[in-house]
């Protein structure tokens, strides 16, 4: 086995969790495609996660990378491969990110610290179980339109959550709870699923993520769908 060079990772954004995952992405600019590569030998040998190193991020980058981290946590929690240990990581990550991202965008110390921890925990979870179609579609939007990855994830996540809702059992109740929604135990299945989706969408709006991607053309839809498959 050919191992990569030893790497000490010091992340400067709170989103991808590249410092703790076995995944990396290669973009083919000519074919307008992104390829996800998975290799346990590509993990850093040491990760130094210091929120002070993230404090220079502008608001837009803080918001988009933070929503990427939230997408990791929610998709990891609802993927078919999820199990008890990864559920523990993902729910805690959702909780931390939900309470931290707004203040991180405002460059508050507590928010930066929370996001540094939340994205790291989410990475520990999804690296073991994979992600979902929000990410596959976000990769396609990034490859074709150069949409920032976190922005694409944030735009796709509520839509995908709604699409997947009937296949998630009671998990959206715990997502809603982790997002800070009150009274979820008194809600019907339909109510807590809607509450979870609405809370995610509202967080995205609150941190300034756009809700529309005007670059998409109807003629591109077949290619986008095939690329995201």
Model-derived regions: residue spans:
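Proline/glycine-rich low-complexity loops and linkers
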Residues: 1-23
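Acidic, glycine-rich active-site loops and adjacent beta-strand->loop/helix elements
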Residues: 12-15, 53, 158-161
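Glycine-rich phosphate/pyrophosphate-binding beta-alpha loops
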Residues: 15, 120-153
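Carboxylate- and glycine-rich phosphate/diphosphate-binding segment that chelates Mg2+/Mn2+
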Residues: 20-129
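A general structural signal for well-ordered alpha-helical segments in protein cores
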Residues: 67, 94, 134, 153-154, ...
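Short alpha-helical scaffolding segments that buttress acidic/His motifs in well-ordered protein cores
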Residues: 70-74, 115-123, 137, 157, ...
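Gly/Pro-rich interdomain helix-loop hinge
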Residues: 144-223
């Amino acid at each position: 086995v050919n191992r990569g060079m030893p790497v000490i990772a010091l992340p400067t954004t709170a989103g991808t969790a590249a410092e703790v995952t076995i995944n990396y992405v290669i973009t083919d600019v000519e074919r307008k495609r992104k390829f996800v590569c998975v290799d346990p030998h590509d993990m850093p040998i040491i990760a130094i996660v210091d929120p002070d190193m993230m404090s220079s991020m502008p608001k837009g980058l803080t918001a988009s990378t933070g929503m990427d981290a939230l997408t990791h946590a929610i998709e990891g929690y609802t993927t078919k491969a999820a199990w008890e240990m990864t559920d523990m990581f993902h729910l805690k990550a959702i909780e931390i990110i939900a309470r931290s991202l707004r203040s991180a965008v405002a460059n508050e110390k507590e928010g930066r610290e929370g996001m540094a921890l939340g994205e790291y925990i989410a990475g520990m979870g999804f690296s073991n179980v994979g992600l979902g179609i929000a990410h596959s579609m976000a990769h396609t939007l990034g490859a074709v339109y150069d949409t920032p990855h976190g922005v694409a994830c944030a735009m796709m996540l509520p839509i995908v959550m709604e699409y997947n809702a009937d296949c998630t059992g009671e998990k959206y109740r715990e997502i809603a709870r982790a997002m800070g929604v009150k009274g979820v135990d008194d809600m019907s299945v339909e109510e807590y699923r809607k509450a979870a989706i609405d809370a995610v969408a509202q967080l995205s709006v609150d941190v300034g993520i756009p809700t529309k991607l005007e670059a998409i053309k109807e003629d591109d839809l077949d290619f986008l769908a095939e690329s995201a498959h």
